[in-house]
Amino acid sequence: MGKIRKLDDQLSNLIAAGEVVERPASVVKELVENSIDANSTSIEIHLEEAGLSKIRIIDNGDGIAEEDCIVAFERHATSKIKDENDLFRIRTLGFRGEALPSIASVSELELITSTGDAPGTHLIIKGGDIIKQEKTASRKGTDITVQNLFFNTPARLKYMKTIHTELGNITDIVYRIAMSHPEVSLKLFHNEKKLLHTSGNGDVRQVLASIYSIQVAKKLVPIEAESLDFTIKGYVTLPEVTRASRNYMSTIVNGRYVRNFVLMKAIQQGYHTLLPVGRYPIGFLSIEMDPMLVDVNVHPAKLEVRFSKEQELLKLIEETLQAAFKKIQLIPDAGVTTKKKEKDESVQEQFQFEHAKPKEPSMPEIVLPTGMDEKQEEPQAVKQPTQLWQPSTKPIIEEPIQEEKSWDSNEEGFELEELEEVREIKEIEMNGNDLPPLYPIGQMHGTYIFAQNDKGLYMIDQHAAQERINYEYFRDKVGRVAQEVQELLVPYRIDLSLTEFLRVEEQLEELKKVGLFLEQFGHQSFIVRSHPTWFPKGQETEIIDEMMEQVVKLKKVDIKKLREEAAIMMSCKASIKANQYLTNDQIFALLEELRTTTNPYTCPHGRPILVHHSTYELEKMFKRVM
């Protein structure tokens, strides 16, 4: 007798459940997505003990016909695709027909459903076995309850985390679904306590406000663009609002939340040097495209996708964000803390946001910032930044970045009056004149410059300011076509491992494009006899070593990245440090040079250069206005 045999359906469902149903959050995701596919406009999610004890989903969707109820719990039974061609034109969130049988095989499940034009159906299933089926009176829609999850798979139950952790996983999934489908009203309850309620009016900014707080919603920048193949819409926060994790960025593809690292990377690249190292924005990006251009059938939970025109999409995202930030004022306001009024009951408010009006009715032409493209430009005269001082060896003393307090979904509502304080996002061209004239007042601790104008008080980090000036100078100088070189008094020898040597050898021609000429010296060494004149004096070998590390790490020469990193490194080393006192003339010259830069708001590492206190804020602090 042969050893290989076909598994029965119940065992097959248990095995499939291992992939589809990892934890309570998986059940919530699959059932809520089924409700959305059934054209529901209102969905309630009730949890007990983070879903381990009970999960109940109530919707007002199309419901399931009596003759389909049993079939729906069979493996690979679905109403969403019919043939292989449909697999490449998927518009629904589900399509495999795996979720319901997998969930039913590891739980006690009760289903009450009706299509509205016939009596409803009541179905009870335990561990995959049908216990009861009968007709019942029911409104249109579906009410499905999952209890005692993993009761028959104790090994899986043993690896569940704490109630708090599992609840966090569920709320994260529900938040993403709420952002993906703002046209659906979602209510989330845990142990009869309301955690989330979205209005379902289609305004995603209201959803973002209810999830991330009204304070974050006030600092959202609308993003919108369209190409031949893609349409993107969404919101991202101003650079001053960041988090320590990428988890606050959500990417939606054709209504489906997906985890895609390259999309998140494109959002970060759109900020370019506006973000501090290790900090990430809060963002929501919805992408619509022809289903033929995306493969959603590559992950058990359908959380990952593959794009057939990925590079075009990434470029569109980067350029759209860069164009958006060119048009808004990026000087962070210090703000005034006001006491929040209390409310008596928790309710989802109708938020009214005044969106910044675009200058043109159509989308502006998207252009990469000057100096950031790959094209080599003809050499031109570049003004050397004013050398106001000798760099100090003392490090900058920086204050830690303060995390903005997130809104607790359990807190009692919002005040509509807060909406009147929504910061106006002014769309102005970033052309070097964005920064208004500043008049120096003085200096504090040899580190911060105080200046004023008719709009209030400005505090400037002098190191960050000159770092931005130097960065734009070096960025323009690095990689010019007509390279001026300077001979080294003593040739510099670079010793590498065999693997490193081979990687560098492949990129010799590319390195020449940034002015670095290497000659082979022995089996695993190179020598450098000259270097570009823009290398800061005394730092030549250090910069060469940095470039070699980049080539070895990347396994290729990324000219744009080399230029960027070299310019950033040199600008930091050549800039003033903390505890260096300046004369009034030096301060004035620094501020005037800062005004000529293309981005006077952040240093190349993304830290803010200046902070603004408006006259109104100062008067409020001193109780001159109430």
UniProtKB/Swiss-Prot annotation:
GO terms for molecular function: ATP binding; ATP hydrolysis activity; ATP-dependent DNA damage sensor activity; mismatched DNA binding. Residues 383-393 have a biased composition (Polar residues). One of its GO terms (cellular component) is mismatch repair complex. It holds the Pfam family MutL_C. Keywords: DNA damage, DNA repair. One of its GO terms (biological process) is mismatch repair. Residues 377-413 are annotated as: Disordered. This protein is involved in the repair of mismatches in DNA. It is required for dam-dependent methyl-directed DNA mismatch repair. May act as a 'molecular matchmaker', a protein that promotes the formation of a stable complex between two or more DNA-binding proteins in an ATP-dependent manner without itself being part of a final effector complex. NCBIfam families: mutl, PRK00095.1-3. PANTHER family: DNA MISMATCH REPAIR PROTEIN MLH, PMS, MUTL, DNA MISMATCH REPAIR PROTEIN MLH1. Belongs to the DNA mismatch repair MutL/HexB family. This is DNA mismatch repair protein MutL. It comes from Bacillus anthracis. The lineage of its organism: Bacteria, Bacillati, Bacillota, Bacilli, Bacillales.
